[in-house]
From Swiss-Prot:
Enzyme nomenclature, EC number: 2.7.4.3
Pfam families: ADK
Family as reported in the entry's similarity comment: Belongs to the adenylate kinase family.
An annotated Gene Ontology molecular function: ATP binding
Binding-site positions, ATP: 10-15, 127, 166
Name this protein carries in UniProt: Adenylate kinase
UniProt cross-references to NCBIfam families, sorted A to Z: PRK00279.1-3, PRK14527.1, PRK14531.1
Uppermost EC category: transferase
GO CC list: cytoplasm
Subcellular location(s) of the protein: Cytoplasm
Function description: Catalyzes the reversible transfer of the terminal phosphate group between ATP and AMP. Plays an important role in cellular energy homeostasis and in adenine nucleotide metabolism.
Gene Ontology BP annotations: AMP salvage
Length: 181
């Protein structure tokens, strides 16, 4: 079971991935968590990632791809994963496809969490992260629209659309139904 989770920042991807991971027994691999771990440990990749995150910009593909590849190579991800935050661009999607095809693997689907911009801003301000100022949120939404939205076209029929408004439980139930679980 290998899924990518798409949607704007604040769409609830991380929340849903954590619930799905627990229910389905596959790891939730979040680039945000990978970045925070590397930043917290002061690794060179982490320090580089921090400068971009603090500015509300996407971390460069080579940095992110190396973190993701290392994580996908860990034992708990061999039978599946829920990938949250990568790919964000068509270039990254091609990198992921190659990483998987090198192991004779492919994605089972792409969960696209759809939510209004007003709900995104409200949710992100409420969670109180240091990197979530209103200016940073709006910058990230602009970057998402410009760079990430083309993934929906790229993935085409693999896209599974999820209405990501309502309670956490309602969204989780919709997601499990859409996955056929």
């Amino acid at each position: 079971m290998r899924y990518v989770l798409l949607g704007p920042p604040g769409a609830g991807k991380g929340t849903q991935a954590a619930l799905l991971s627990e229910k389905l027994g596959v790891p939730h691999i979040s680039t945000g968590d990978l970045f925070r771990a590397n930043i917290g440990e002061g690794t060179p990749l982490g320090l580089e990632a921090k400068s971009y995150i603090d500015a509300g910009k996407l971390v460069p593909t080579d940095v992110t791809a190396r973190m993701v590849e290392d994580r996908l190579n860990q034992d708990d991800a061999k039978d599946g994963f829920l990938l949250d935050g990568f790919p964000r661009t068509v270039q990254q999607a091609d990198i992921l496809e190659k990483l998987l095809s090198d192991k004779d693997l492919k994605l089972d689907g792409v969960l696209n969490f759809e939510v209004s911009e007003d709900v995104v801003v409200e949710r992100m301000l409420a969670r109180g992260r240091a990197d979530d100022t209103e200016e940073t949120i709006r910058t990230r939404l602009g970057v998402y629209r410009e760079e990430t939205f083309p993934l929906i076209e790229h993935y085409g029929d693999a896209i599974i659309s999820i209405k990501a408004e309502g309670t956490v439980e309602e969204i989780n139930e919709r997601t499990l139904q859409a996955m056929g679980k």
